[in-house]
């Protein structure tokens, strides 16, 4: 784009395009979008508030651009000496170049007397030009734009124009006053001030500068008075809104050297100054006062200026506060996006890791998360405050709060995730540590204090959680408080501790139950093994009297109660080291009693299984039948009352069946008060405490009564057991009877007399024959030696064994020979355990008929196993 005979801006060559500055607004009222690039190119953007904006007004072709070029070292286009036409079109801007030259050439001790930094100069299109004619729209818009943005308004007039209305730009100044009043009405909270700097050109000195100053002030007062003021401002003065400065410069062409010197002198006035209250607020130093500054940061000036011009060119009411707020919103949002880039670089890696860990189901405590969050938050807020605090305060605070919310929303998620991970990992580590310590104590075989282990590991877990939480806390963030999380963590630790204690008490109860099972198994087994032993041999106790069979349940109950009482003492003593509550101990003891009864009942059922009980009844019967009261085995003779002893022993043993069929105490003649002994269900018991318990009749509501619980044998089993026992007893009786009958075979005395009479010749023959006699002698000597060595007994036993074996073998072969034939007698076999009895038909006296009847029954029944 070409304007004023040179490029206004070009993208390819910034140095060439910005040699003459930048055209802010062209003659068609279009705003230049590259203004921000120019400010960045000139290094003004990072200046913040350390910049100043000056605008120059004046009639066309009065040397405004020339004045600026000499005064600020700019390169604005100037009018050709041979032509009288418009040169500056629209509004141009350039940075002060004289400042850079002075900084390079001045000595260090003169640095404080140089021009202010970052002075921006706007060259406004001249008024009263023939190109615009009577169109004063751009004149008014440009004046409003300059007044809304500039600190100092330079009015360029010639000396001979002072006192004139149009020539002295009084019409333009009236426009300036009117638009200033318009701006003031929109911004009632403050009174914006500007400096009107009159530079009188071609000053000859004939009329003193003070007189020219008075003339101009009178004209300005008159214009101000003629303005229509809004309500409440009727008595306002021009000094309420403007300050005035005056300077005079000699003729440029006729007094060139003096002009240059005065311009240089004038340039030194463009620096920071202040009001001295001791001198009536008189300005000292430079002309740039802080109250003139529009408080628009340099990095937002381009956006602000564009918004101002858009309002002006569209004939909208210009509202500077609103524009400042809009600018602040725009720039704060922009700055927020910029600073969040660095924030994302610091935070996103942790967010990604935490999300992956949560998705995998293994939350992880990340080291360094807390410092990273703190640094990211502090640096982001600091960077935002550095850049954005220069803008509208309310907007800045609002945007700062929004930025904090954005960051805190993400940081809070990280914070919560970190605490959640610390919570879960802490609970897992606590549980594992307690279990490991308990196992270590069990392996050592020594007693360990479970409560001490839990308290120690709980303290370690709390310290670890607090360390992780403190490392993640962000100071100043209201959400960065882990009090609730810590309370929840402590609550879960207590819950886990209670569960671990409950599990340990369960294990303790299991160990005690095993001990009870072992003790009851031995004690109850001994009672049943000693059941009905009627002899003083192996079945009787080593010391003391034989226990009565009638009191077997009393003894079992006493053993049971004593064993459980000892187990309860063991449980209570061990549970005290768990720091268990009374309720938990009560539940444990209640469960122990129920479990112990189940163990006893199981042991009784085992002992009273049909095979076991039948064996014990047979042993009881045999002890009473085969042994006398002293425990000596009976040798059956035909003269013994076998049938009487058999009947007595059988009936005595049969009395045990009804005795054993019901758990009844002999002392009270009633069943034990099991429901009272077990006790009521503790109030602290949970359904989990009862789910593995076997219902007990008379205690639980399972439909069984206490009598049914104490019934060990049903009526059907009793009858079946009685029948089978009688058959086994009959077999023992038959064996005893056969043994008695076998003892009757004796050799008569007359047989020996007959043998001597009939064998006398043979005896004489032996005595007369030397060989026979010698053989007899040898046999006699051998018999004598055997007698002396006491070997007759062993030899007789060996002979008996050999003969018995020969007889058995003969019987077997004879049986095999007669087996296909129906002729012969068949023996009956009675088995019990590993014993086998073979019986043939025994017919003798009055017992022959009875034995034959039993044999007939046995042939029908077949073989019985016990």
From Swiss-Prot:
Role according to the record: Cooperates with the reticulon proteins and tubule-shaping DP1 family proteins to generate and maintain the structure of the tubular endoplasmic reticulum network. Has GTPase activity, which is required for its function in ER organization.
Membrane topology: Multi-pass membrane protein
Residues that coordinate or bind GTP: 58-65
Subcellular location: Endoplasmic reticulum membrane
HAMAP family found in the cross-reference section: Sey1 (MF_03109)
Pfam family, one: Sey1_3HB
Domain GB1/RHD3-type G: 48-305
UniProt region (Disordered), positions on chain: 840-866
GO BP term, example: endoplasmic reticulum membrane fusion
Chief location: endoplasmic reticulum
Coiled coil (residue ranges): 480-506
Protein name: Protein SEY1
Cytoplasmic topological segments: 1-746, 792-866
Superkingdom in the source lineage: Eukaryota
Topological domains annotated Lumenal: 768-770
Class of enzymatic activity (EC top level): hydrolase
Transmembrane segments: 747-767, 771-791
Keyword Nucleotide-binding: yes
Molecular function terms, GO-annotated: GTP binding; GTPase activity
Family membership: Belongs to the TRAFAC class dynamin-like GTPase superfamily. GB1/RHD3 GTPase family. RHD3 subfamily.
GO CC field: endoplasmic reticulum membrane
Entry keyword set: Coiled coil, Endoplasmic reticulum, GTP-binding, Hydrolase, Membrane, Nucleotide-binding, Transmembrane, Transmembrane helix
């Amino acid at each position: 784009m070409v304007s004023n005979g040179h490029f206004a801006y070009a993208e390819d060559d910034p140095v060439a395009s910005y040699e003459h500055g930048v055209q802010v607004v062209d003659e068609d009222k279009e705003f230049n979008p590259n203004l921000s690039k120019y400010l960045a190119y000139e290094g003004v953007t990072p200046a913040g508030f350390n910049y100043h904006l000056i605008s120059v007004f004046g009639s066309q072709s009065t040397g405004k651009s020339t004045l600026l070029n000499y005064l600020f070292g700019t390169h604005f286009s100037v009018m050709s000496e041979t032509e009288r036409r418009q040169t500056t079109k629209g509004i141009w801007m350039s940075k002060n170049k004289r400042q850079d030259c002075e900084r390079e050439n001045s000595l260090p001790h003169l640095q404080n007397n140089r021009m202010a930094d970052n002075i921006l100069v706007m060259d406004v299109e001249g008024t009263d030009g023939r190109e615009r004619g009577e169109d004063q729209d751009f004149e008014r818009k440009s004046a409003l734009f300059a007044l809304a943005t500039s600190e100092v308004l330079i009015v360029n007039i010639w000396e001979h124009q002072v006192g004139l209305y149009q020539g002295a730009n009084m019409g333009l100044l009236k426009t300036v006053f009117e638009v200033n009043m318009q701006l003031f009405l929109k911004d009632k909270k403050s009174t914006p001030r500007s400096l009107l700097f009159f530079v009188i050109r071609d000053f000859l000195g004939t009329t003193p500068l003070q007189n020219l100053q008075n003339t101009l002030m009178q004209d300005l007062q008159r214009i101000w008075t003629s303005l229509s003021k809004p309500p409440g401002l009727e008595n306002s003065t021009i000094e309420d809104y403007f300050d005035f400065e005056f300077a005079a410069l000699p003729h440029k062409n006729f007094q060139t050297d003096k002009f240059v010197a005065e311009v240089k002198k004038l340039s030194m006035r463009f620096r920071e100054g202040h009001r001295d209250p001791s001198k009536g607020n008189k300005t000292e130093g430079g002309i740039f006062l802080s109250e003139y500054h529009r408080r628009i940061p340099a990095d937002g000036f381009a956006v602000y200026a564009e918004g101002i011009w858009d309002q002006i060119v569209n004939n909208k009411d210009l509202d500077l506060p609103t524009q400042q707020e809009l600018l602040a919103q725009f720039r704060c949002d922009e700055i927020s996006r910029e600073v969040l880039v660095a924030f994302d670089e610091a935070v996103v890696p942790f967010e990604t890791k935490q999300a992956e860990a949560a998705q995998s189901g293994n939350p992880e405590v990340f080291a360094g998360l807390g410092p990273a969050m703190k640094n990211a938050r502090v640096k982001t807020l600091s960077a935002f405050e550095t850049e954005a605090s220069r803008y509208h305060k309310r907007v800045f605070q609002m945007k700062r709060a929004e930025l904090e919310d954005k960051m805190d929303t993400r940081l809070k998620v990280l914070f919560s995730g970190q605490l959640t991970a610390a919570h879960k990992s802490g609970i897992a580590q606590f549980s594992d540590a307690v279990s490991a310590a308990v196992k270590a104590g069990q392996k050592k075989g020594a007693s360990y204090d479970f409560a001490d282990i839990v308290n120690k590991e709980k303290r370690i877990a709390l310290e670890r959680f607090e360390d992780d939480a403190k490392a993640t806390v962000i100071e100043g963030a209201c959400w960065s408080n882990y009090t609730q999380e810590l309370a929840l963590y402590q609550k879960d630790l207590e819950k886990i501790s209670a569960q671990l204690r409950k599990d340990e008490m369960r294990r303790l109860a299991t160990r005690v139950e095993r001990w009870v099972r072992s003790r009851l198994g031995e004690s109850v087994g001994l009672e049943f093994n000693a059941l009905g032993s009627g002899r003083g041999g192996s079945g009787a106790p080593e010391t003391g009297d034989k226990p009565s069979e009638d009191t077997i349940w009393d003894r079992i109950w006493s053993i049971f109660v004593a064993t459980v009482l000892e187990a309860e003492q063991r449980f209570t003593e061990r549970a005290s080291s768990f720091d268990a509550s009374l309720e938990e101990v009560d539940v444990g003891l209640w469960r122990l009693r129920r479990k112990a009864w189940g163990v006893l009942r199981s042991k009784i059922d085992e002992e009273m299984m049909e095979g076991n009980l039948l064996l014990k009844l047979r042993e009881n019967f045999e002890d009473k039948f085969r042994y006398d009261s002293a425990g000596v085995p009976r040798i059956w003779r035909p003269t013994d009352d076998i049938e009487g002893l058999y009947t007595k022993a059988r009936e005595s043993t049969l009395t045990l069946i009804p005795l054993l069929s019901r758990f009844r105490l002999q002392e009270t003649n009633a069943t034990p008060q099991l429901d009272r002994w077990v006790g009521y269900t503790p109030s602290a018991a949970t359904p989990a405490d009862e789910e593995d318990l076997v219902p007990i009749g008379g205690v639980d509501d399972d439909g069984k009564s206490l009598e049914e619980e104490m019934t060990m044998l049903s009526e059907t089993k009793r009858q079946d057991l009685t029948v089978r026992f009688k058959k086994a007893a009959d077999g023992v009786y038959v064996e005893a009877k056969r043994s008695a009958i076998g003892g009757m075979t004796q050799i008569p005395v007359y047989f020996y007399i007959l043998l001597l009479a009939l064998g006398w010749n043979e005896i004489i023959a032996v005595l007369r024959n030397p060989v026979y006699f010698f053989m007899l002698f040898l046999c006699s000597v051998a018999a004598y030696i055997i007698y002396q060595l006491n070997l007759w007994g062993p030899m007789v036993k060996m002979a008996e064994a050999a003969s018995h074996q020969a007889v058995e073998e003969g019987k077997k072969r004879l049986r095999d020979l007669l087996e296909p034939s129906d002729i012969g007698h068949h023996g009956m076999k009675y088995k019990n355990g590993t014993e086998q009895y073979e019986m043939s038909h025994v017919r003798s006296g009055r017992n022959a008929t009875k034995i034959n009847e039993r044999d007939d029954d046995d042939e029908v029944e077949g073989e019985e196993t016990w």
